[in-house]
A protein has these predicted regions:
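Amphipathic, well-ordered alpha-helical segments in soluble domains
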Residues: 39-46, 76, 80, 111, ...
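Extracytoplasmic/secreted envelope proteins and their assembly/folding machinery
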Residues: 33, 40, 44, 66-70, ...
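Short, helix-capping/interhelical loops that line the mouth of catalytic, cofactor-
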Residues: 16-31, 82-136, 161, 190-196
Length: 196
């Protein structure tokens, strides 16, 4: 009996390996929703109530202001959504070569700084933080609802842009926001950042 159970367990593991990454689990969905809610809350906390001087503080000519950081998040929202929606199902094997840990570290470690693609730079047309937050909330609600309710197997869909699966891309959207929240905190910690 024990030998049959071990054999059955071995067959199940082998089938999972052959089939590639298993579908997104409910626990993964919960983790993704929790991460998205966390970053949304942090972003709101960091930018709500800023004065115009604080939102437009630029410590150096090459730096973005807090308003530009928020603008960038708003600009990339529809682009990243489109990337997620156009993720292609893979016939077999693993979708992408990224791992979840790397995606999480992307949001935490700003040691390696990236330059935004030209199409993803701040539009510089965002007039104030409130209008930026309104646009962000709309985009975020759409993505969050999709993540909460989708029946799509995000683990078997490839987002070619990042060579990752759909779950990782949705998580990367949230960790991308987390990176920029850290950037906002760096701006606020600058010695010349306005007090009011």
């Amino acid at each position: 009996m024990r030998a049959r159970m071990v054999s059955a367990a071995f067959v199940m593991v082998a089938e999972a390996i052959v089939a590639g990454t298993p579908p997104m689990t409910e626990l993964e969905r919960q983790h993704l929703v929790a991460h998205m809610q966390m970053t949304a809350s942090w972003l709101e906390d960091e930018v709500s109530g800023l004065s115009a001087a604080q939102a437009s503080f630029r410590p150096s000519p090459a730096s973005w202001t807090i308003l530009e950081v928020l603008d960038h998040i708003v600009v990339v929202g529809p682009i990243y959504w489109k990337d997620l929606q156009s993720a292609k199902p893979v016939a077999e094997g693993r979708a992408g070569r990224m791992n979840d840990i790397d995606v999480l570290w992307y949001g935490i470690d700003r040691t390696f700084r990236e330059t935004a693609l030209r199409s993803e730079e701040p539009s510089r047309t965002l007039k104030d933080v409130q209008s930026g937050l309104m646009a962000y909330r709309t985009q975020h609600a759409k993505l969050l609802e999709y993540v909460r309710t989708t029946k799509d197997d995000l683990r078997s869909r490839l987002v070619e842009r990042q060579n990752c699966d759909g779950y990782q891309w949705a998580l990367l959207i949230s960790t991308h926001e987390q990176r920029h929240i850290l950037q906002i905190r760096e701006l606020k910690a600058h010695p010349e950042y306005p007090k009011h």
